[in-house]
Each structure stands twice: as C-alpha cells, then as structure tokens.
Amino acid sequence: MASSSGLRSCSAVGVPSLLAPSSRSGRSGLPFCAYATTSGRVTMSAEWFPGQPRPAHLDGSSPGDFGFDPLGLATVPENFERFKESEIYHCRWAMLCVPGVLVPEALGLGNWVKAQEWAALPDGQATYLGNPVPWGNLPTILAIEFLAIAFAEQQRTMEKDPEKKKYPGGAFDPLGFSKDPAKFEELKLKEIKNGRLAMLAFVGFCVQQSAYPGTGPLENLATHLADPWHNNIGDIVIPRNIYGP
C-alpha cells in the first residue's frame, strides 16, 4: 500500500554483492531497492544494509563500494581517493601475508610467531625455511627494507594519476588482465573482496596469537577441534571454574 511519505520499489538493475557471484562487468544480478518519494526523488538502497539509503557520496562506481561509510570518512573526495588507495595496498599485503603464515606451518616448517624470534637475539641470524639468509642480520635487513620501500614509495608519489597508483599495469600486469575492460572491472571487485577477507584473517591470527602466545593458527585450530569446550576464546576471557573443570 502506498503511503503519503513515499513509494517503495525494487529495480532489477544489478549491483555488487558480497555474497553473489560477479558478472563480467563486476556487478551481481541481485536487485536493489529504491525509494520513490512524492517529490520524485529516487534513492538507492545500500547493499550492505538493505532498506537503508545509500550515502550520497557513495555512488557504487568504485570496486567494493557497497554504501558502507557510517563514520562519513569518504565525504571529502580527496580523502576518499586516498582511502581507496590505502585499502587496496593493505589488501595486497594481507593476501601475501595470509598464505605466508599458513603454508610454512602446514608444511611443518614452524609458525609465523617463532620465525621472527631470531631478531631478538644479539647475534641473531635470519633464516628462510630453515636456511640461513645472506646478510641475514637485523641491521642489514632493516637497511635493505628501508631502501626498497623508499624507492617504491617515491615512484608511487610521483605518479599523479590516481588509477595508475592503484593499478599501475605494465610490468605489474604480465598476463594482460587489464586489456579487457569488462574483465578488468570484475577482477578489481574480486581483488577487493578477497583482500578484505585476508585483512580480517590476519587480524584473527593476531588475536589468536595474543590469546595463545607462541602458537600458529593451524596449531591453535587443531587444539580447538580436539576439545572445543575448553579450548576457545572463552577459556581466556572467562575463568574456567565458572563453567566446569
């Protein structure tokens, strides 16, 4: 039934969804809801919270834009562009980090927590998968890392095109994924979705390690599965004598 405040309608136009598979254009086939008011103004519904209006400054044109900005961080266009750039870089680091944490532990080569213990020793020697690293002392590694990151950051700062900052192409696209514009948009959306999951995964690794120091995520998972009732986050934050021996 129509009310005096407005009519609610659903359009079949596709918008991105976290759960739905992406099409070649990077959009899903799920419908979005719009609100048609008596004044004729139509407002798209935010995909992250159906029924809530999409913020005016988020038009859905950016990969992974689902209308979620409760703190209004993206209201200033310059800030929004900087946040998009920062997010995609952190996504890529996280996607490198998560398999880097899981794979060595799965192969029985130690966990990511113990891998860095050498740095705390006076004459510590860095190793990679059990093998000594050339020039593997802490000052040398820090110097190499500083110079490498400084060079990369300088090149990024000199680039004025915001799209090329995020997607430089060229040598960074050896398989030519960006040649097909429609496919490229789909891959952008997949990258941001997987990157966000990877960032959450790494936060989970850090929380898990803080709760059970010295253990890796796979070891901790195996311990939890062996005795879920006693080996869980509640075992850390709630005294055990409250819920039994």
Swiss-Prot record:
Induction: By light. Keywords: Chlorophyll, Chloroplast, Chromophore, Magnesium, Membrane, Metal-binding, Phosphoprotein, Photosynthesis, Photosystem I, Photosystem II, Plastid, Thylakoid, Transit peptide, Transmembrane, Transmembrane helix. Chlorophyll a 2 binds at H90. Chlorophyll b 3 binds at E153. Binds at least 14 chlorophylls (8 Chl-a and 6 Chl-b) and carotenoids such as lutein and neoxanthin. Chlorophyll b 1 binds at W48. Chlorophyll a 5 binds at K190, Q208. Chlorophyll b 2 binds at R92, V133. Its main location: plastid. It is found in: Plastid, Chloroplast thylakoid membrane. InterPro entries: Chloro_AB-bd_pln (IPR001344), Chloroa_b-bind (IPR022796). The keyword Phosphoprotein applies. This is Chlorophyll a-b binding protein 1B-21, chloroplastic.
